[in-house]
A protein has these predicted regions:
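Alpha/beta-hydrolase
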Residues: 25-26, 130, 222
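Catalytic nucleophile-loop/oxyanion-hole region of alpha/beta-hydrolase
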Residues: 57-91
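Residue-level signal for short, function-critical loop segments
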Residues: 28-29, 131-133, 195-196
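Hydrolase active-site cap/lid region
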Residues: 122-167
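Alpha/beta-hydrolase fold nucleophile elbow
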Residues: 92-103
Length: 250
């Protein structure tokens, strides 16, 4: 099943392949490829091959100075964009791919895609963003410390928030608009969000996409969902919408 991909990469093939397109997954910040097991199983059921790998999203994996050798920028966002691009290069057997990215790491995937559209204009046919990215990165950095990392001390959260945010990117996601301007006209994108998301507000996600008329984007709004729990807790809403979107990509 697996070739020798770096970063524990796995190419997981559908039992009955019905599409030539590969679903390329990028997990959420400081997550793990195993967290996407349900997503991979579902797209396999639909007849799509899937690819997953582990991000190098800990500062120590970059000697505490994450840096992009492509964009020449410091910050975890830009370093992860390089890693994502490297894995895309390893999958040249698949001429067409669909990007499926989670939370604010979807912004890293957008950075990679904006670069690649120049030389690989037909490679990435569509994008799915689950629970992100958000336009207000300082806010989501604060909520990351509170909700995901469980930091209870208010003074410590206030001190740590700018460290986390600027360690991600000094652009603080203002560069997402420049990335999206590079996307092709009428580019298909599905934005999945939970109305009860405590980390990235749906309105902050809308702020990313609404200015861009070249993006043909659709929303899947889950009124009872929080951050990243749509497929796990609300499969009856999540699965049909995802299947319909994928099947619309010809």
């Amino acid at each position: 099943m697996n070739q020798n991909f770096p970063d524990d990469g796995e190419l997981i093939k559908a039992t009955e392949r019905k599409s030539d397109k590969l679903i390329f997954f990028v997990h959420f910040f400081q997550g793990h490829k195993k967290a996407l097991k349900r997503h991979v199983e579902f797209v396999n059921e639909l007849g799509y091959d899937a690819y997953i790998f582990n991000l190098k999203d800990r500062a120590k994996q970059h000697s505490y100075i994450p840096y992009s050798t492509v964009s020449k920028k410091f910050g975890m966002k830009h370093a992860l964009a390089d890693q994502i691009e490297h894995h895309l290069d390893l999958l040249s057997d698949y001429n067409e791919k669909i990007m499926f990215a989670f939370s604010n790491v979807a912004g890293c995937a957008m950075e990679t895609m904006a670069r690649r559209f120049k030389n690989h204009p037909h490679e990435i046919q569509a994008m799915i963003c689950d629970s992100g990215p958000g336009a207000k990165f300082i806010y989501s950095s604060y909520k990351l410390l509170q909700e995901q990392f469980g930091m209870k001390s208010l003074p410590l959260r206030i001190i740590s928030t700018p460290v986390i945010a600027l360690g991600w990117s000094k652009e603080l996601h203002k560069d997402l608009h420049e990335h999206l301007k590079q996307f092709p006209e009428n580019f298909p994108l599905l934005s999945i969000r939970g109305w009860r998301d405590k980390m990235i507000s749906p309105s902050h996600i809308d702020d990313v996409f609404e200015p861009h008329q070249n993006i043909n984007w659709k929303k899947l709004s889950l009124p009872e969902a929080g951050h990243l729990n749509g497929l796990r807790d609300f499969p009856s809403e999540y699965k049909p919408a995802l299947a319909d979107f994928l099947q619309s990509i010809k």
